[in-house]
Amino acid sequence: MPNNDYLTIYGEQIKSRLLIGSALYPSPAVMNESIVASGAEIVTVSLRRQQSAAAGDDFWQLIKNTGLKILPNTAGCHSVKEAITLAKMCREVFATDWIKLELIGDDYNLQPDPFALLEATKILIDDGFKVLPYCTDDLVLCQRLNALGCEVLMPWGAPIGTGKGLLNSYNLKTIRERLPEATLIVDAGLGLPSHACQALELGYDAVLLNSAIAGAGCPITMSRAFKAAVEAGRFAYNAKAMPEKDVAAPSTPTMGMPFWHQE
């Protein structure tokens, strides 16, 4: 892979194509070691998840100590007003105009609300935010978000926390083909390193992981596995895989074979 093969997010060049979440780990120490082992340069955080000032201070100090770029999110928001308010709070607290916009429309499968997402995206972009919207694998929705000014899109692979992988690789592939200039990050639903590898093989620019690492038997080892998988997937994409065929083709030359083997 060339040394200048960077992930680009709103003009910033990032070496790692793995973004990592900061929730659900069995302990702060495991979270810290897992983040380091992943090689990630961007960590997502939720302002809502800190229950007490003391716990919040400890958490932020751990995150700051990693030296990674923070991508705050609006996890848990169900309305446009709620998401806008939280996004503005995040901008003040974290001193960044990046926001991972999450607006849930269904509590059963945590599917994003496409209508509220479009409305909130426009408001935030008009207010100077650089929005990274968490969305479904719907082509038209992704096109609309891109047209509003989202340079980065984050379609799901499957519902959050399911670990099912890429349920609709056709849709994801279509989005990649139709939006060649957008930075595309598969967010949610990945469970195995092979899922992340597949996303990169499809031409996606990165993956965002949380449950797949935090919920593993050994999160630190799983972080290393995902790091290797993402690198392998990007290598494979850049190498341009052989075309798939419906008919077998021998890999061994037939020249020099006995004539009775060529009948």
UniProtKB/Swiss-Prot annotation:
Substrates-to-products reaction catalysed: [ThiS sulfur-carrier protein]-C-terminal-Gly-aminoethanethioate + 2-iminoacetate + 1-deoxy-D-xylulose 5-phosphate = [ThiS sulfur-carrier protein]-C-terminal Gly-Gly + 2-[(2R,5Z)-2-carboxy-4-methylthiazol-5(2H)-ylidene]ethyl phosphate + 2 H2O + H(+)
List, alphabetically, the GO terms of the cellular component aspect. Answer: cytoplasm
- An example Gene Ontology molecular-function term: thiazole synthase activity
**Annotated pathway:** Cofactor biosynthesis; thiamine diphosphate biosynthesis
Indicate what this protein is called per its UniProt record.
Thiazole synthase
The annotated subunit structure for this chain is: Homotetramer. Forms heterodimers with either ThiH or ThiS.
Catalytic residues per the record?
100 (schiff-base intermediate with dxp)
Name a biological process GO annotation. thiamine diphosphate biosynthetic process
Q: Which species is this UniProt entry from?
A: Pseudoalteromonas translucida (strain TAC 125)
Pfam hit, one = ThiG
Gene assigned in the entry: thiG
What are the binding positions for 1-deoxy-D-xylulose 5-phosphate in this chain?
161, 188-189, 210-211
What Enzyme Commission number(s) appear in the record? 2.8.1.10
